[in-house]
Amino acid sequence: MLKNSHIYIIWLFGFISGFNVMITGNTLNYWFAKKDIALQTIGMLSFITLPYSINFLLAPVFDTVQIKYLNKILGHRLSWICLTSTTLISLIFILSFLDPSTDLVLLSFIAFIISFFSAAQDTILSALRTKIVPKESLGFTSGIYILGYRVGMLLASSGAIYLSIYLTFNAIYKIFAGVIFVYLILLILVARYTNSFDVMEENTSYSYVARCYAIADMNLKNKFFIKNYFNYFKNFISAYLLKIFSGFYFHRNDINLAYYIILILIFLVLYRLPDNLINVMINPFLLHLGYNAFEIASVCKFCGVMGAIIGGLIGGIIMKYKNILYSILLFGIIHALSHIFFILLEINGKNSLILFITIGVESITGGMTMTAYIAFISSLCQGKFRATQYSLLSSMMGISRSIFPIISGYMVVNFGWQNFFLFTTIITIPSLLILLKIKTKIN
C-alpha cells in the first residue's frame, strides 16, 4: 500500500535528481560561457557528465556493499544516500571557491567527481524507488517523480541563472550545497516513518555478471598477455549482451541478434545527438546574440521546460492512437525541422519573438521525441533482465550527451553557427534510416 510518506520521498527523489544534473550540466555550462571560455573548451567539457552514462555499472555495488557504521544507524539504502549527499555537499562547496577563468582544470575535475556521485545517487534512488512503490502505484508515483525532477531542474537552471543577475556563481554554488544539505535532512526525517529503506533483495540481472566472467575465461589460457585480456573482455561483453538481450521480441528467430542489438544502440545514440549538440552550445549562442541572464532564464529555461512538459503530453496522446515506431519516426522528422528556427534566429539577430517561437517549437517537439524515445526503450525490454536492459539502453542517451558533443565547439568555430544548426538538422537522417532498417524486425 502506498503511504503518504512514500509520496513525499518520491518527490524528493525526483527533485534532487533534477537538481543535481543541472549543477554540472546546463548551469555550469552557462557559467563557462559567461566567463568567455573558448567554445572548443566548452564543447570538450561536456565529458563532465559522462558518469551518468555508466551509472548502471555501479548498481551491483550499492545493492550488495554495506557501509559498516552508517548501516547500523540509517539502514542500507539511506546510509548510501547519506554518504553520497555529504560528499556532494563538500565537493560543491569546494567548487564554489574556484573561478573558471583561472582554475578551469581543477574546477572541471571536481565537477566530474560531482557528476560521478550525482550519478551514483541516482542509481541508489532508482533502485529504492522500485522497492518502496507498489506495482499498482508506479504510474502515479512516476508522475510525482517527474514533477519533482522538473522542479529541481528549474531551480538549479532557470533559478540559478536568474540569481546570477544579483549574485556571483560562487555564491550560487554555495547555495546549491545548502539545498542538498536541507534535502538530506528532510529525507532522513521523512524516512524515519517507513521501513522500506532497509529492504534488500537479490537482483538476478546482476548475479548473471559473475557467470559471464566464467564464460569469458574459457579457452583463454596460453595466449599472449594483451591478446588474452582483449579476448577476455570481448567474450565477457558478448556473453553479457547476448544473454540480457535474449528476451527481445523479433519477428524472426533466425536473425542475427548481435547485429540488430548494435543497430539499436547506434540508433539510440544518433537519435538524441542533435539535441545534445545544441544543448552544449545553446548558452554560448544566446550570449553571442546579446541576450541577458533574465531573458535566458525566463524564455529559454523556464519556457523550455514548460514546452517539454507540453510536448510530452502531446506525444503521449498521439501514441495512444499510433504505434511507437511510427511515432518516434514522425516526431524525429518534426523535431529535426524545428532546428531550422535557430538558423532564422542567427540570421535575424536578437529578436525576442523569434526566440520565443524557436524555444517553444524546439521544446515541444523535443518533449514529443523524448516521450517516444523512452517508450521505445521500454518496449524493447523483455524477460527477467528487463531492468538491466533498460539501464544499458538508456545509458546510450548519456553517451550521446557526454562524448559526441565534445566536437560541438570546434564545429561552431570552424563552420559557423548556421552550418552548425544545419548539421543538427541533417544528422537526424542516419538515425531514422537505421530505424527503418530495424522496424521490420521488431514486434
From Swiss-Prot:
Membrane topology summary: Multi-pass membrane protein
Listed GO MF terms: transmembrane transporter activity
NCBIfam families assigned: 2A0125
Gene3D superfamilies xref list: MFS general substrate transporter like domains
Natural source organism: Rickettsia prowazekii (strain Madrid E)
Organism domain of life: Bacteria
Disulfide bridge map: none
SUPFAM superfamilies: MFS general substrate transporter
Keywords: Cell inner membrane, Cell membrane, Membrane, Transmembrane, Transmembrane helix, Transport
Protein name: Putative transporter AmpG 1
